[in-house]
Amino acid sequence: MYDYIRGTLTYVHTGAIVIECQGIGYHIAITERWAIECIRALHQDFLVFTHVIFRETEHLLYGFHSREERECFRILISFSGIGPKLALAILNALPLKVLCSVVRSEDIRALASVSGIGKKTAEKLMVELKQKLPDLLPLDSRVETSQTHTTSSCLEEGIQALAALGYSKIAAERMIAEAIKDLPEGSSLTDILPIALKKNFSGVNKD
């Protein structure tokens, strides 16, 4: 029904965004990983590729940063026992390129590590994904990746993102500094922010 929605990104929450387009605010479920990255685009023009699920009482929108990721989502929800929430959880834990690698190497343990998927489900899903691998491989090869050093600009963006969530500059700087200690060189902002927020739950406040 909708290929994509383009408008102003007005709200970012854990696993969801709101895009205003022609006076209508579209609530769109996305991965938590991408939601963290979306914070930087608040109040800016934004495009998201969408998948709509129609139910008797509601229409649910799911969003993706690329058509390739959306196609992977559609492949996942075609499997018995995999609903949209679990499919998003899989893509959150195992982004498209990683998921393709997991399937190629038949890494059952990695797939079973996703919350909501046990070993038996992972084994069954792996068999089905292997059958779909010809569909996934072209997507994997088209996904652009970049390995960059953790630059000062990246750290500054992290501080700004935390500030947008209500953290003071001092708290944000401390959280980012602690997070990068646990990450390898070349980590991106998408890697840094989840660690920073996780550490916050262990005792860092917003002040």
From Swiss-Prot:
Stretches for region Flexible linker: 145-150
Region (Domain II): 66-144
Recorded superkingdom: Bacteria
Ranges for region Domain I: 1-65
Localization terms from the record: Cytoplasm
Pfam families listed in its UniProt record: HHH_5, RuvA_N
A GO CC annotation given for this chain: Holliday junction resolvase complex
Cross-referenced Gene3D superfamilies: 5' to 3' exonuclease, C-terminal subdomain, DNA helicase RuvA subunit, C-terminal domain, Nucleic acid-binding proteins
Gene Ontology MF terms: ATP binding; four-way junction DNA binding; four-way junction helicase activity
Keywords: Cytoplasm, DNA damage, DNA recombination, DNA repair, DNA-binding
Region of interest: Domain III: 150-207
Annotated signal peptide: none
SMART domains: HhH1
Biological process per Gene Ontology, one example term: DNA recombination
SS bond partners: none
Family recorded in the similarity comment: Belongs to the RuvA family.
Domain comment (free text): Has three domains with a flexible linker between the domains II and III and assumes an 'L' shape. Domain III is highly mobile and contacts RuvB.
UniProt-listed NCBIfam families: ruvA
Function, as annotated: The RuvA-RuvB-RuvC complex processes Holliday junction (HJ) DNA during genetic recombination and DNA repair, while the RuvA-RuvB complex plays an important role in the rescue of blocked DNA replication forks via replication fork reversal (RFR). RuvA specifically binds to HJ cruciform DNA, conferring on it an open structure. The RuvB hexamer acts as an ATP-dependent pump, pulling dsDNA into and through the RuvAB complex. HJ branch migration allows RuvC to scan DNA until it finds its consensus sequence, where it cleaves and resolves the cruciform DNA.
Subunit field text: Homotetramer. Forms an RuvA(8)-RuvB(12)-Holliday junction (HJ) complex. HJ DNA is sandwiched between 2 RuvA tetramers; dsDNA enters through RuvA and exits via RuvB. An RuvB hexamer assembles on each DNA strand where it exits the tetramer. Each RuvB hexamer is contacted by two RuvA subunits (via domain III) on 2 adjacent RuvB subunits; this complex drives branch migration. In the full resolvosome a probable DNA-RuvA(4)-RuvB(12)-RuvC(2) complex forms which resolves the HJ.
Protein name: Holliday junction branch migration complex subunit RuvA
The organism's taxonomic lineage, starting at the top: Bacteria, Pseudomonadati, Chlamydiota, Chlamydiia, Chlamydiales
Record gene name: ruvA
